Amino acid sequence: MLKLGIMGSTRGTDLQAIINGINNGSIDAQVNIVISNNKEAYILERAELNKLPFKFISDQEISREEFGNRATKVLKDNGVDFILLIGFMKILSTKFCREWSDKILNVHPSLLPKYAGGMNNKVHQQVL
């Protein structure tokens, strides 16, 4: 069973799809931790409603590398095998990406790098 760490900054719609897949047996995984850099993000409430462990890590007034160090500690402390970035609105450090190389997937609603920063229908309309 894959032990997931989910990182998101927005509503967590994809988190709900993952939870549903785990619950119906189509995904052989468990969510060990949900991390957000946005304390107002609904993904944290969604995690709480589904009785999943969650953690807010502020990205204010710290370097990208320090944020990555803090996130890595939380992920490792929670036994994470694989990270899913779903609606995660922060660029991660090179060090973080290298440390989690081959263990991280970014679910992005846009075609990168041309439409970076786009979300939802706005980005789909731009692409079309």
Feature annotation, model-predicted:
Residues M1-L128:
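One-carbon transfer enzymes
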